[in-house]
Curated annotation (Swiss-Prot):
<keyword id="KW-0378">Hydrolase</keyword>
<comment type="function">
    <text>Catalyzes the hydrolysis of UDP-3-O-myristoyl-N-acetylglucosamine to form UDP-3-O-myristoylglucosamine and acetate, the committed step in lipid A biosynthesis.</text>
</comment>
<protein>
    <recommendedName>
        <fullName>UDP-3-O-acyl-N-acetylglucosamine deacetylase</fullName>
        <ecNumber>3.5.1.108</ecNumber>
    </recommendedName>
</protein>
<keyword id="KW-0444">Lipid biosynthesis</keyword>
<feature type="active site" description="Proton donor">
    <location>
        <position position="264"/>
    </location>
</feature>
<keyword id="KW-0862">Zinc</keyword>
<feature type="binding site">
    <location>
        <position position="78"/>
    </location>
    <ligand>
        <name>Zn(2+)</name>
    </ligand>
</feature>
<dbReference type="InterPro" id="IPR004463">
    <property type="entry name" value="UDP-acyl_GlcNac_deAcase"/>
</dbReference>
<comment type="similarity">
    <text>Belongs to the LpxC family.</text>
</comment>
<keyword id="KW-0441">Lipid A biosynthesis</keyword>
<dbReference type="GO" id="GO:0103117">
    <property type="term" value="F:UDP-3-O-acyl-N-acetylglucosamine deacetylase activity"/>
</dbReference>
<dbReference type="GO" id="GO:0009245">
    <property type="term" value="P:lipid A biosynthetic process"/>
</dbReference>
<dbReference type="GO" id="GO:0046872">
    <property type="term" value="F:metal ion binding"/>
</dbReference>
<dbReference type="GO" id="GO:0016020">
    <property type="term" value="C:membrane"/>
</dbReference>
<feature type="binding site">
    <location>
        <position position="241"/>
    </location>
    <ligand>
        <name>Zn(2+)</name>
    </ligand>
</feature>
<comment type="pathway">
    <text>Glycolipid biosynthesis; lipid IV(A) biosynthesis; lipid IV(A) from (3R)-3-hydroxytetradecanoyl-[acyl-carrier-protein] and UDP-N-acetyl-alpha-D-glucosamine: step 2/6.</text>
</comment>
<dbReference type="Pfam" id="PF03331">
    <property type="entry name" value="LpxC"/>
</dbReference>
Length: 303
């Protein structure tokens, strides 16, 4: 049986919020079967919980924000991408502020944290959402689509009219049956253009952003001294974001996601449309792991 997974141990980290610039303490904790991923604002009394579900998404400008009443958690997508990539079904994410720390701008540090905590299988079947037919949302020339696929595949195309990106790969397709999330996607960093950063800062966004946690691009090239981690790091980061946004379904997917210039808002619209169209998907479990179209790395012992 493919079983649900949680963390073996509690683990902590410190970072800054990308948009707020505030110092944030992050604690990842094991959670019982069928809990899902639940964010907790531990700085509030009483503590406020926000389950990582599509229905709880509020703001989608520049990042994905979860809300519960007037309480929010910003920039959840990179951590959720790491949870999805490692197959974590159940965990508590405690925060000392309203934003998940940006770390280095990728999912890599979160993958390291989760692997350091160790993974533990639980005594219940892992639930997958299998896509049964095409579901699409469009907005202007942007598009996001789910398609049936025996496995998990993410295809993405971006179209930035910028001298640096025009000459680089702006599309990628990753089939996770043959490609490692950890090696090929998790280290892709968020990116920003110098021309936008002043505008963002005027609106109290990207206050914690720097070349330490993003790829910064001006008219002449990439400003980061070490350059890019992947030749197609820009579009790979969009794939990383999409995987995090899709995990707000609450389960791992069996299907293909295709995005054309899609972002957090359109990704969330697609999830809401899918959830509403109950004939477009089904929940499945696998008694025999060898029959599943998706496999996960064996749980690793805590470091």
């Amino acid at each position: 049986m493919i079983k649900q997974r949680t963390l073996k141990n509690t683990i902590r980290a410190t970072g800054v919020g990308l948009h707020s610039g505030e110092k944030v303490y992050l604690t990842l904790k094991p959670a019982p079967v069928d809990t899902g991923i639940v964010f907790r604002r531990a700085d509030l009394d009483p503590v406020v919980e926000i389950p990582a579900r599509a229905a709880n998404v509020g703001e989608t400008t520049m990042s994905t924000t979860l809300v519960n009443g007037d309480v929010k958690v910003d920039t959840v997508e990179h951590l959720l991408s790491a949870m999805a990539g490692l197959g974590i079904d159940n965990a508590y994410v405690e925060l000392s502020a309203s934003e998940v720390p940006i770390m280095d701008g990728s999912a890599g540090p979160f993958v390291f944290l989760i692997q350091s905590a160790g993974l533990e299988e639980q005594d219940a079947a892992k639930k997958f959402i299998r896509i049964l037919r095409e579901v699409t949302v469009e907005e202007g020339d942007k598009r996001a689509t789910f398609l049936p696929f025996e496995g998990f595949k993410v295809s993405f195309e971006i179209d930035f009219d910028h001298p640096v990106l025009r000459n680089r790969t702006q599309s990628a397709s990753v089939d996770f049956s043959s490609t490692s999330f950890v090696k090929e996607v998790s280290r892709a960093r968020t990116f920003g253009f110098m021309r936008d950063i002043e505008y963002l800062r005027k609106h109290n966004l990207a206050l914690g952003g720097s070349v330490e946690n993003a790829i910064v691009v001006d008219e002449d090239g990439v400003l980061n001294e070490d350059g890019l981690r992947y030749e197609d790091e820009f579009v790979k980061h969009k794939i990383l974001d999409a995987i995090g946004d899709l995990y707000l379904l609450g389960n791992s997917l069996i299907g293909e996601f295709k995005g054309y210039k899609s972002g957090h808002a359109l990704n969330n619209q697609l999830l809401r449309k899918l959830i509403a169209e109950t004939d477009a998907w089904e929940v499945v479990t696998f008694e025999d792991a060898s029959t599943a179209p998706i496999s996960y790395m064996r749980p690793v012992a805590a470091v």
